Structures are given as structure tokens and as C-alpha cells.
């Protein structure tokens, strides 16, 4: 299986619950290497840009408001089949449908405040990583 990179966000509601370390531990226990991470507070412009594909949808303004309501943690995870395995660990987007033991089952509050984000394809992962990480901010892992 090919080594992939995927993009992850720990959203404001999960950051506020002080579960960043718990989530990172679950990433590592699942076999992911954390090759880039940082905490930031999105501006409205950054949030609108990141979620531009949803502009015009009924939930867009609420999503932007939520994503700018507090700090987030963005990370790049590396591993075999990383995109799909990360999405499996996150659970269903709607936490009401998330299986027990997934991050959204454990840390989500609602459909919008679902605790985490994960790329849905290798292509979107590359785009999302480039949105938040510049040259030299993601480390190569050799071990």
C-alpha cells in the first residue's frame, strides 16, 4: 500500500474541550505519523477561502462563524492509505451517525460542531495542506 498524506483539523469545540492530546494519541495509536502541526485562529477570510466550495449553501455562514470562534489545530498525517484510514477514525460527518469509538462519536457536539475535519481524497489533502502549510513546514519522516 502507498504511503499518503492527509490533512486534519481539530475544530474549535474540540480544542475548547482540551482533548488535543487525546486526539493526537489516537492518531499515533492508529499508526499515523504527525509530520506537521500548528495551532491558529482562523480569520473570516481564511475560513471562507478554505470552505469556498460550500459558499452559497445554507450552512456556509454558520460554518464560517463556528470555525472562527476559537483556535483550531491543523495537522498533516502520514501513513498507508492515510486519507481513508483517517476518515474512518473520524467517523461519519454527522455525529448522530458516527460509530462508537470514532473521534466524532467521542468529541462532536452537532453536525456543524463535529470536532474534526479530514480530507476526502488525496487531491483535496494536497490542496488543504498547501492552504495552511508553506514550504518547509511539513517534515519528511524516515522512521
Swiss-Prot record:
Q: Name one GO biological process term.
A: pyrimidine nucleotide metabolic process
Reactions performed catalytically = a 2'-deoxyribonucleoside 5'-diphosphate + ATP = a 2'-deoxyribonucleoside 5'-triphosphate + ADP; a ribonucleoside 5'-diphosphate + ATP = a ribonucleoside 5'-triphosphate + ADP
EC number(s) on record?
A: 2.7.4.6
**Pfam families documented for this protein:** NDK
Q: Which residues form the active site?
A: 117
Modified positions (Phosphoserine) are 119, 121
Q: What is the effect of changing residue 119 to A?
A: Still autophosphorylates. No change in kinase activity
Q: Which domain of life is it from?
A: Bacteria
Q: Which cofactor does it need?
A: Mg(2+)
Listed A to Z, the keywords are:
ATP-binding, Cytoplasm, Kinase, Magnesium, Metal-binding, Nucleotide metabolism, Nucleotide-binding, Phosphoprotein, Transferase
Q: What is the annotated localization of this protein? A: Cytoplasm
Q: Which GO terms describe its molecular function?
A: ATP binding; metal ion binding; nucleoside diphosphate kinase activity
**UniProt-listed PROSITE patterns:** NDPK, NDPK_LIKE
The answer to whether the entry has keyword Phosphoprotein is yes
Positions bound to ATP: 11, 59, 87, 93, 104, 114
Classification via Gene3D superfamilies: Nucleoside diphosphate kinase-like domain
UniProt family annotation: Belongs to the NDK family.
How does this chain assemble?
A: Homotetramer.
What's this protein's function?
Major role in the synthesis of nucleoside triphosphates other than ATP. The ATP gamma phosphate is transferred to the NDP beta phosphate via a ping-pong mechanism, using a phosphorylated active-site intermediate.
Protein name as annotated: Nucleoside diphosphate kinase
Amino acid at each position: 500500500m502507498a504511503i499518503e498524506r492527509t490533512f486534519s483539523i481539530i475544530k474549535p469545540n474540540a480544542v475548547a474541550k482540551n482533548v488535543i492530546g487525546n486526539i493526537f494519541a489516537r492518531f499515533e495509536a492508529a499508526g499515523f505519523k504527525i509530520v506537521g502541526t500548528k495551532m491558529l485562529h482562523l480569520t473570516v477570510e481564511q475560513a471562507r477561502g478554505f470552505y469556498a466550495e460550500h459558499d452559497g449553501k445554507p450552512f456556509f455562514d454558520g460554518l464560517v462563524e463556528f470555525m472562527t470562534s476559537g483556535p483550531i489545530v491543523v495537522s498533516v498525517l502520514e501513513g498507508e492509505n492515510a486519507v481513508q484510514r483517517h476518515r474512518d477514525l473520524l467517523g461519519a460527518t454527522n455525529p448522530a451517525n458516527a460509530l462508537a469509538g470514532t473521534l466524532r462519536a467521542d468529541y462532536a457536539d452537532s453536525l456543524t460542531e463535529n470536532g474534526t475535519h479530514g480530507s476526502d481524497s488525496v487531491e483535496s489533502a494536497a490542496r488543504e495542506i498547501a492552504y495552511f502549510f508553506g514550504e518547509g513546514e511539513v517534515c519528511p519522516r524516515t522512521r
